[in-house]
């Protein structure tokens, strides 16, 4: 496959391999690059560089490849803890995942945990690669494993009966030892991924939202709020809401500027200043958001999925219990919240990932899948995601 320059003409999709340790995630990643990208050997992918996301160090390998229909950015993590951290911090956003399961072992504890995490962090779709099928001679056993995987997916509210399961061997693909379960299976897998994993909506097509980072008053002109537009478009003359911390208020954007130049609109990715009509300097603050009216609402209570840093990662040295009161850093500001642990969980140790209920002392513009950091006095001790809103 000739490598031309990166063509922006194809839709872009972020994807990743998930599944139990040693079931073949990295070998499969290498095999996909062999047929659809610039070949990366197992060792190149496995020696993933460390990166920091929200103050947390994560090892992640990034590869890219393309099918006829799409361009893919693919993440693969060497260790289980890296997956947990990656999915919770959203360091590697996943529009879909390839779940790798060894046919010889069937679903294992991390298989289950990664499916649960995918559900909690809102990975929209999963395609399954049943790996190492050459190690299983009995077709009935293969069927049984497939059934087990489908049941497990359904249990975590994925459409287990409809999810494509492709059977093959990543090793056979890498070694060219058996075309049918090697190359053919990898090509079939990517055809299923192309078909089954939906193309994500581009940020610019979503309703406007901008977290407010700073507030200025400009004499004779009014109040300007600055920030980076997270999604959507805002045009001069449009009505917006200011949401979070205080009661929601409405205003009109009377000007948009970027790099000191006046624009008629600001869009996803732009760092802008928005001039607001009839709002004084005291009427708005960092931590609120500017949003399309009715698109986002303020909440104080939610269920979270969180990863708590180990001591070595710079986190807490001791466990915490129900009624723990750290700060939750959403977008641009810290808000104190009270933690309630689920029944049967007495305490949370550094290094755990946990589902917990949180009640904030002031409301924040919130939606499912919003990420946050957990902090104590400005120091990050955990990362989390809003799994569901309770109130």
Swiss-Prot record:
Which intervals of the chain are annotated as region G3?
76-79
- Location (main, coarse): cytoplasm
**Catalyzed reactions per annotation:** GTP + H2O = GDP + phosphate + H(+)
Tell me the segments the record calls region G4: 131-134
GO CC term (a single one): cytosol
Where is the protein found, in the record's own terms? Cytoplasm
Query: Looking at the keywords, is Transferase present?
Result: no
Q: Where is this region: G2?
A: 55-59
PROSITE patterns according to UniProt: G_TR_1, G_TR_2
User: E.C. number, please?
Assistant: 3.6.5.3
The record places domain tr-type G at 10-201
Location of region: G1: 19-26
Keywords attached to this entry: Cytoplasm, Elongation factor, GTP-binding, Hydrolase, Magnesium, Metal-binding, Nucleotide-binding, Protein biosynthesis
Which superkingdom, per the lineage? Answer: Bacteria
Which residues are recorded as binding Mg(2+)?
Answer: 26
Stretches the record annotates as G5: 169-171
Signal peptide stretch: none
Single GO molecular function = GTP binding
Where along this sequence does the record place binding of GTP? 19-26, 76-80, 131-134
* Oligomer status and interactors: Monomer.
Tell me, in a sentence or two, what this protein's role is: GTP hydrolase that promotes the GTP-dependent binding of aminoacyl-tRNA to the A-site of ribosomes during protein biosynthesis.
Q: Which family does it belong to?
A: Belongs to the TRAFAC class translation factor GTPase superfamily. Classic translation factor GTPase family. EF-Tu/EF-1A subfamily.
In terms of NCBIfam families, this protein maps to:
EF-Tu, PRK00049.1, PRK12735.1, PRK12736.1, small_GTP
> What is the designated name of this protein?
Elongation factor Tu
Q: Which organism is it from?
A: Chelativorans sp. (strain BNC1)
């Amino acid at each position: 496959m000739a490598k031309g320059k990166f063509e922006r003409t194809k839709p872009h999709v972020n994807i990743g391999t998930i599944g139990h340790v040693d079931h073949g995630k990295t070998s499969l990643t290498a095999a996909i690059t062999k047929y659809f990208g610039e070949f990366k050997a197992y060792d190149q992918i496995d020696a993933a560089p460390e990166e920091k996301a929200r103050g947390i160090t994560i090892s992640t390998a990034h590869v890219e490849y393309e099918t006829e229909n799409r361009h893919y950015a693919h993440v693969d993590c060497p260790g289980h803890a890296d997956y947990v951290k990656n999915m919770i911090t959203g360091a590697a956003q996943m529009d879909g995942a390839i779940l790798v399961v060894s046919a010889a072992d069937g679903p294992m504890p991390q298989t289950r945990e990664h499916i649960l995490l995918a559900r909690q962090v809102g990975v929209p779709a999963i395609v399954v690669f049943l790996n190492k099928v050459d190690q299983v001679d009995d077709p009935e056993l293969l069927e049984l494993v497939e059934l087990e995987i489908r049941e497990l997916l359904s249990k975590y509210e994925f459409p287990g009966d409809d999810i494509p399961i492709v059977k093959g061997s990543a090793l056979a693909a890498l070694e060219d030892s058996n075309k049918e379960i090697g190359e053919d299976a990898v090509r079939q897998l990517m055809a299923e991924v192309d078909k089954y994993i939906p193309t994500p909506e581009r940020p610019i097509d979503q309703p406007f939202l901008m977290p407010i980072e700073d507030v200025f008053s400009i004499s004779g002109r009014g109040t300007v709020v600055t920030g980076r537009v997270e999604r959507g478009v805002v045009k001069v003359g449009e009505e917006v809401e200011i949401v979070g911390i205080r009661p929601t208020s409405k205003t009109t954007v009377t000007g948009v500027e970027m790099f000191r130049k006046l624009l008629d609109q600001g869009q996803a990715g732009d760092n802008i200043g928005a001039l607001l009509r009839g709002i004084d300097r005291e009427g708005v603050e960092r931590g609120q958001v500017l949003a399309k009216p009715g698109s986002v609402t303020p909440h104080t209570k939610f269920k979270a999925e969180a990863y708590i840093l180990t001591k070595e990662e710079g986190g807490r040295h001791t466990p915490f219990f129900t009624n723990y009161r750290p700060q939750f850093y959403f977008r641009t500001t810290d808000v104190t919240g009270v933690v309630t642990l689920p029944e049967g969980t007495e305490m949370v140790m550094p290094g755990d990932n946990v589902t917990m209920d949180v009640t904030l002392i002031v409301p924040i513009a919130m939606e499912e899948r919003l990420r946050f950091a957990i902090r104590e006095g400005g120091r990050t001790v955990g990362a989390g995601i809003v799994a569901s809103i309770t109130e």
